Amino acid sequence: MSMPTMTLVNQLLIALPSMPDPHFARGVALICQHDSNGSMGVVLNRPSEYTLGEVLFQMGIETASETLREQVVLAGGPVHPDRGFVIYDSEHVWGPSLLIGDGLYLTTSRDVLTAMAEGSGPSRALVALGCAGWAAGQLELELVENNWLMVPADASLLFDTALEQRWQRAAGRIGVDLFRLTDYTGHA
């Protein structure tokens, strides 16, 4: 009899103070895909050096929305840093999109950005350049090594919480105060 496969999709990874990788120190990542081949996610609390207005301009997409032009683009991770990823919350699906869970989608389609620029896109969306990737078994090992806490994804944390507050707030959802933890780990 085989063991059921656990999926980490639609989970938030919260880097513990002991996280050795500087790409993820004090990071929060949404796991978008997880299977026997590995995992893929997007870091949710690292601003890139770009605004959405700059990205749209480079893509030849115009928008009249000042709010959209000023939106910070996230540095989603060290993998494919020149590729755009859009996480959105909607009943409508734009282009080829991956359902993460509870009406939350991930896409690399230009369609959603065009719709956002025209005012007909999702009302809540995060745009990131790059993503995070883990080889088969790598993320599970990092969890065993106490590099991450894990909590179910929450749309309000993604879309309604300021970038600089996401790390603490995500951990707070399970009663953890990250500033009271040591950066030393061990196993009992």
From Swiss-Prot:
Disulfide cross-links: none
GO CC, alphabetical: cytosol
One Pfam match: DUF179
SUPFAM superfamilies according to UniProt: VC0467-like
InterPro entries documented for this protein: AlgH-like
Membrane-spanning intervals of the chain: none
Superkingdom field: Bacteria
Residue ranges that the Swiss-Prot or TrEMBL entry lists as coiled coil: none
HAMAP family linked to this entry: UPF0301
PANTHER family given in the database record: UNCHARACTERIZED PROTEIN YQGE (PTHR30327), UPF0301 PROTEIN YQGE (PTHR30327:SF1)
Family of this protein: Belongs to the UPF0301 (AlgH) family.
NCBIfam families: PRK00228.1-1
Protein name: UPF0301 protein XF_2228
